[in-house]
């Protein structure tokens, strides 16, 4: 029986690279591309099938920044499949990034230059917005939409006799200082992306505590510093092109400078081959590239309090109840 792999954000960047790499290793997979843009998804499917004709590739339209779209897409997935072996929670946004050029140049000549390059801490803020669901856009897109997707797909994911895996695309930018249980959506702060990624790490721990006994395991990874549409929103592409030689040189000291989506997907592919029971839920697995261009995976212990993770999970469940009620009322106005 073909293994079924569902990937959100599969039409570009790391998600697209992941699709190609998985099929290159096992073209007997059934990939399901969960994408917002159907035309782009169809183009990706055609390209993948042209190079891997024995594979199966299907498409589900899904916008993780819309609860209605997630629920509708999940229903379509449940009609197509009886189980999911892997769910890659990869879609995400970094909207309206504000780059602090002064802090960047100061950082280059400081002892924190490596930390700055790998986390963007201190040089990057974002202007968030509110979705039609009344939630902060970064929070809903990067975390809550995926949480609802997991909840909707539980019947396909929870099989104690044959474990399924959740694999989240997180970030080194995930910082405890940018997250608060009193403001889980980071509506009052300047770094919603960092907050959403730390929330991802928390949820990963809570999901393992609550679902391992049901045969569902969760892991988080960091792709490193990758050139994608997301990073092109921070600086123009030509600036990144000028920075490439510096980044290649720095790889001898900073293995997080993976640069290409192919390299950035290394940990995603590595996790695909691991027995989920053997993985540490408190470890973030990071894609790394050596100065000589060799890809490998490193493990980093996360700064996570398990009780906080459980409290966050409970807050998400309460938010789910509230938001579902609101959406149902909008679907059926009196």
From Swiss-Prot:
<keyword id="KW-0560">Oxidoreductase</keyword>
<dbReference type="GO" id="GO:0048568">
    <property type="term" value="P:embryonic organ development"/>
</dbReference>
<keyword id="KW-0752">Steroid biosynthesis</keyword>
<keyword id="KW-0444">Lipid biosynthesis</keyword>
<dbReference type="GO" id="GO:0006695">
    <property type="term" value="P:cholesterol biosynthetic process"/>
</dbReference>
<keyword id="KW-0443">Lipid metabolism</keyword>
<dbReference type="GO" id="GO:0007399">
    <property type="term" value="P:nervous system development"/>
</dbReference>
<dbReference type="GO" id="GO:0000253">
    <property type="term" value="F:3-beta-hydroxysteroid 3-dehydrogenase (NADP+) activity"/>
</dbReference>
<dbReference type="InterPro" id="IPR036291">
    <property type="entry name" value="NAD(P)-bd_dom_sf"/>
</dbReference>
<feature type="glycosylation site" description="N-linked (GlcNAc...) asparagine">
    <location>
        <position position="229"/>
    </location>
</feature>
<feature type="glycosylation site" description="N-linked (GlcNAc...) asparagine">
    <location>
        <position position="37"/>
    </location>
</feature>
<dbReference type="InterPro" id="IPR042829">
    <property type="entry name" value="HSD17B7/Erg27"/>
</dbReference>
<protein>
    <recommendedName>
        <fullName>3-keto-steroid reductase/17-beta-hydroxysteroid dehydrogenase 7</fullName>
        <ecNumber>1.1.1.270</ecNumber>
        <ecNumber>1.1.1.210</ecNumber>
        <ecNumber>1.1.1.62</ecNumber>
    </recommendedName>
</protein>
<comment type="subunit">
    <text>Binds to the short form of prolactin receptor.</text>
</comment>
<feature type="binding site">
    <location>
        <position position="171"/>
    </location>
    <ligand>
        <name>substrate</name>
    </ligand>
</feature>
<dbReference type="GO" id="GO:0030154">
    <property type="term" value="P:cell differentiation"/>
</dbReference>
<keyword id="KW-0520">NAD</keyword>
<dbReference type="Pfam" id="PF00106">
    <property type="entry name" value="adh_short"/>
</dbReference>
<keyword id="KW-0521">NADP</keyword>
<comment type="pathway">
    <text>Steroid biosynthesis; zymosterol biosynthesis; zymosterol from lanosterol: step 5/6.</text>
</comment>
<feature type="glycosylation site" description="N-linked (GlcNAc...) asparagine">
    <location>
        <position position="127"/>
    </location>
</feature>
<keyword id="KW-0812">Transmembrane</keyword>
<feature type="active site" description="Proton acceptor">
    <location>
        <position position="193"/>
    </location>
</feature>
<keyword id="KW-0472">Membrane</keyword>
<comment type="pathway">
    <text>Steroid biosynthesis; estrogen biosynthesis.</text>
</comment>
<feature type="binding site">
    <location>
        <begin position="8"/>
        <end position="15"/>
    </location>
    <ligand>
        <name>NAD(+)</name>
    </ligand>
</feature>
<feature type="glycosylation site" description="N-linked (GlcNAc...) asparagine">
    <location>
        <position position="178"/>
    </location>
</feature>
<dbReference type="GO" id="GO:0008209">
    <property type="term" value="P:androgen metabolic process"/>
</dbReference>
<dbReference type="GO" id="GO:0007420">
    <property type="term" value="P:brain development"/>
</dbReference>
<keyword id="KW-1133">Transmembrane helix</keyword>
<comment type="function">
    <text>Bifunctional enzyme involved in steroid-hormone metabolism and cholesterol biosynthesis. Catalyzes the NADP(H)-dependent reduction of estrogens and androgens and regulates the biological potency of these steroids. Converts estrone (E1)to a more potent estrogen, 17beta-estradiol (E2). Converts moderately dihydrotestosterone (DHT) to their inactive forms 5a-androstane-3beta,17b-diol and 5alpha-androstane-3alpha,17beta-diol. Does not metabolize progesterone. Additionally, participates in the post-squalene cholesterol biosynthesis, as a 3-ketosteroid reductase.</text>
</comment>
<feature type="topological domain" description="Cytoplasmic">
    <location>
        <begin position="251"/>
        <end position="334"/>
    </location>
</feature>
<feature type="topological domain" description="Extracellular">
    <location>
        <begin position="1"/>
        <end position="229"/>
    </location>
</feature>
<dbReference type="GO" id="GO:0005783">
    <property type="term" value="C:endoplasmic reticulum"/>
</dbReference>
<dbReference type="GO" id="GO:0047024">
    <property type="term" value="F:5-alpha-androstane-3-beta,17-beta-diol dehydrogenase (NADP+) activity"/>
</dbReference>
<dbReference type="GO" id="GO:0048706">
    <property type="term" value="P:embryonic skeletal system development"/>
</dbReference>
<dbReference type="GO" id="GO:0005789">
    <property type="term" value="C:endoplasmic reticulum membrane"/>
</dbReference>
<dbReference type="InterPro" id="IPR052834">
    <property type="entry name" value="3KSR/17beta-HSD"/>
</dbReference>
<comment type="similarity">
    <text>Belongs to the short-chain dehydrogenases/reductases (SDR) family. ERG27 subfamily.</text>
</comment>
<keyword id="KW-0256">Endoplasmic reticulum</keyword>
<dbReference type="GO" id="GO:0004303">
    <property type="term" value="F:estradiol 17-beta-dehydrogenase [NAD(P)+] activity"/>
</dbReference>
<dbReference type="GO" id="GO:0006703">
    <property type="term" value="P:estrogen biosynthetic process"/>
</dbReference>
């Amino acid at each position: 029986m073909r293994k079924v792999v569902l990937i959100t954000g599969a039409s570009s960047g790391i998600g697209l690279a992941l699709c190609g790499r998985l099929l290159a290793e096992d073209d007997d997979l059934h990939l399901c591309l969960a994408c917002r843009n159907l035309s782009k998804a169809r183009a990706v499917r055609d390209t993948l099938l042209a190079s891997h004709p024995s594979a199966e590739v299907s498409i589900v339209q899904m916008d993780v920044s819309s609860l209605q779209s997630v629920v509708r897409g999940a229903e379509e997935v449940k009609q197509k499949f009886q189980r999911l072996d892997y769910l890659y929670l990869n879609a995400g946004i970094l909207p309206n990034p504000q780059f602090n050029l002064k802090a960047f140049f100061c950082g280059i000549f400081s002892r924190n230059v490596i930390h700055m390059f790998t986390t963007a801490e201190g040089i990057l803020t974002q202007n968030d917005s509110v979705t039609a669901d009344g939630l902060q856009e970064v929070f809903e897109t990067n975390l809550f939409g995926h949480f609802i997707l997991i909840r909707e797909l539980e019947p396909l994911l929870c099989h104690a006799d044959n474990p399924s895996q959740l694999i989240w695309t997180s970030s080194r930018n995930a910082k405890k200082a940018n997250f608060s249980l009193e403001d889980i959506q980071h509506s009052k702060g300047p770094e919603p992306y960092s907050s959403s990624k730390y929330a991802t790490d928390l949820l990963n721990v809570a999901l393992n505590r609550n679902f391992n006994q049901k045969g569902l395991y969760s892991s988080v990874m960091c792709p490193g510093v990758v050139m994608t549409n997301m990073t092109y929103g921070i600086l123009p592409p030509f600036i990144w092109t000028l920075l490439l030689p510096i980044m290649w040189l720095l790889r001898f000291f900073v293995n997080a400078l993976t640069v290409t989506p192919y390299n950035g997907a290394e940990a995603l592919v590595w996790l695909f081959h691991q027995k989920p029971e053997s993985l540490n839920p408190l470890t973030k697995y990071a894609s790394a590239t050596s100065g000589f261009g060799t890809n490998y995976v490193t493990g980093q212990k996360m700064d996570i309090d398990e009780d906080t993770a459980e409290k966050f999970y409970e807050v998400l469940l309460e938010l789910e109840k509230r938001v579902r009620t609101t959406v149902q009322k909008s679907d059926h106005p009196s």
